[in-house]
């Protein structure tokens, strides 16, 4: 989609290069930037100096009501009347100022505090999690998002992806993989 837009109009408003830099004929790498038409970014949170995963991913949606909820959750009510921020098109042109201010807001909060504050306001947000943090989250096992399999032998127990939803009375059976030649 981004490539089609770039080919058609020559720029991508949701990318950090807009409006100050020229676009080539391919979609540029976007770093921490969401590339889908919304202002999404990965922000440093409290502890980032020693924890490589002390970040939260926050999305500012384009809709006026969604942006109002986000601005109020941040305590940035001034954005609602500031012509640099009070429309989606204006925000596209001033995205670096948005990233900077939200970054200052997030830096003294843990990724879980950021997630708690913003999710209560309906702002799309999530903590950046390591594989270890994901594997230690019991709720993911409770809902079959992750399952533990005891393979036995040298492999022992390992974690894999489960089926976290119901399909017409189908209940998946989890168990060890067949040994080499064991399923022939």
Predicted segments — roles?
Residues 1-112, 145-155:
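Acidic, glycine-rich segments within the central catalytic cores of soluble metabolic enzymes
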Residues 37-39, 119, 160-163:
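A generic structural signal for well-ordered coil/turn residues at beta-strand boundaries
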Residues 42, 57, 126-127, 166:
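Structured core elements
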Residues 54-56, 121-124, 163:
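A short pocket-lining beta-strand/turn micro-motif at the edge of beta-sheets
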Residues 119-140:
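Conserved PLP cofactor-binding pocket of PLP-dependent enzymes
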Residues 154-184:
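Flexible, small-/acidic-enriched active-site or ligand-binding loops
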């Amino acid at each position: 989609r981004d490539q089609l837009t770039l080919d058609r109009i020559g720029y991508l408003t949701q990318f950090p290069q807009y409006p100050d830099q020229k676009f080539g004929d391919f979609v540029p790498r976007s770093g921490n930037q969401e590339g889908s038409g919304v202002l999404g970014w990965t922000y440093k949170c409290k502890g980032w100096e020693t924890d490589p995963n002390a970040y939260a991913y926050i999305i500012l949606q384009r809709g006026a009501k969604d942006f109002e909820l986000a601005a109020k959750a941040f305590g940035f009510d001034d954005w609602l009347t500031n012509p640099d921020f009070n429309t989606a098109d204006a925000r596209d042109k001033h995205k670096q100022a948005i990233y900077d201010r939200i970054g200052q807001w997030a830096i003294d909060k843990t990724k879980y505090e950021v997630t708690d504050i913003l999710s209560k306001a309906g702002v799309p947000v999530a903590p950046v999690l390591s594989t270890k943090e994901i594997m230690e989250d019991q709720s993911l096992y409770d809902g079959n998002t992750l399952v533990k399999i005891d393979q036995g032998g040298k492999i022992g127990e390992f974690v894999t992806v489960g089926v976290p939803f119901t399909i017409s009375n189908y209940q998946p059976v989890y168990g060890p993989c067949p040994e080499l030649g064991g399923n022939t």
